[in-house]
Amino acid sequence: VTAIVEQRPVWTENPPAKEGRMYQVQVDGEIFVAPIVINAAGVYADEIHNMICEEKIRIVPRRGEYRLMDKNCGDLVNSTIFQQPSKMGKGILVTPTVHGNLLVGPTAEDIPDKQDVDTTAEGLTKVLNLGSNSVDALDGRQTITSFAGLRAHLVHEEPAEKSDFLIGEAEGHPGFIDVAGIESPGLTSAPAIG
């Protein structure tokens, strides 16, 4: 998707043909034609959506940082421990992995860069400090690796509007289907979304 966005593809709707409306996507000089376009572009779904839809959406990348602890920490808990959720997400969890390690995180930080999956000292400190609220025996020296990922946070002008899971056909554009703003629980909901 990044290459599509950086190439600024031209999206056009052809007049209805015998088989119905067709969409044309141009990428690197190649043209792809299809009656259905599924926009599942993650943090770039707003840019794809806004190329064709009059009603604009905005997605902000929300970075989540994790620590993976050594296996000698794996017996500190035997089930997933969640903290009190906030408006930013479900909070820092502590959970055992299938390999016997302990996973702690994620943070939730809205950032401007849609490709920034770097971990930060501040974020990893926050993971350890908040994770220690649930499991006080966490020791940062037992961290074997850390990583970050991005969730696609759908921003609305009206705070009362639902802020995730924009799934469906775009108004006025039959066959253009958005699957955008899938935050949490994205993995759990994937089978139902399709």
Question: Where would I find each of the regions flagged by the language model?
Answer:
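Glycine-centered tight beta-turn/hairpin loop motif at sheet-sheet or coil-to-beta transitions
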Residues: 27-30
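Short hydrophobic core segments
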Residues: 32-44, 194
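A conserved short coil-to-beta-strand element within the FAD-binding core of flavoproteins
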Residues: 1-23
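Conserved FAD-binding catalytic core of PHBH/FMO-like flavoproteins
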Residues: 66-106
